[in-house]
Regions:
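Conserved helicase RecA-like core
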Residues: 1-137
Length: 137
């Protein structure tokens, strides 16, 4: 048996290679069409890579913004974005795999307690984050 929360191509290939007649079971609510919750608003901002931090900083200035999580592809980018936003006056913390367990817990604790309202994380490090009142991702 093989269980996976997600089914990226590598997992599908693994199942096809080593399993006989694998069955893909998808857990889904009836009527759920894979769309986001109706209360979620999705917006896309197209910008040049060199302007990303500037655009993010402007978005973070939105009125009524609560806790915000920003995802970065690499550990280096995660640390750089957190540093750049902190230099612009935002209360930020970075969360990535190069941090020790104590530093990761401290960053999450500060985010949960409101001392930091912007958490910049890699997707791997961010798994399992459960924080209330996150308004922007």
């Amino acid at each position: 048996m093989l269980f996976s929360a997600t089914m990226p191509g590598a997992v599908v290939a693994l199942a096809r290679r080593y399993m006989s007649k694998p069955t893909h079971i998808r857990a889904q609510d009836p009527g759920d069409e894979g769309m986001t919750v109706t209360t979620v608003q999705q917006v896309v901002y197209r910008t040049h890579a060199l302007n990303k931090v500037e655009v993010v900083a402007r978005i973070l200035q939105a009125a009524g913004r609560g806790r915000t999580i920003i995802f970065a592809r690499t550990k280096r980018t995660c640390a750089r974005v957190a540093e750049d936003l902190a230099a612009r006056g935002f209360a930020t913390a970075a969360l990535h795999g190069d941090l020790g367990q104590g530093a990761r817990e401290q960053a999450l604790r500060a985010f949960r307690n409101g001392k930091v309202d912007v958490l910049v994380a890699t997707d791997v490090a961010a798994r399992g984050i459960d924080v209330d009142d996150v308004t922007h991702v």
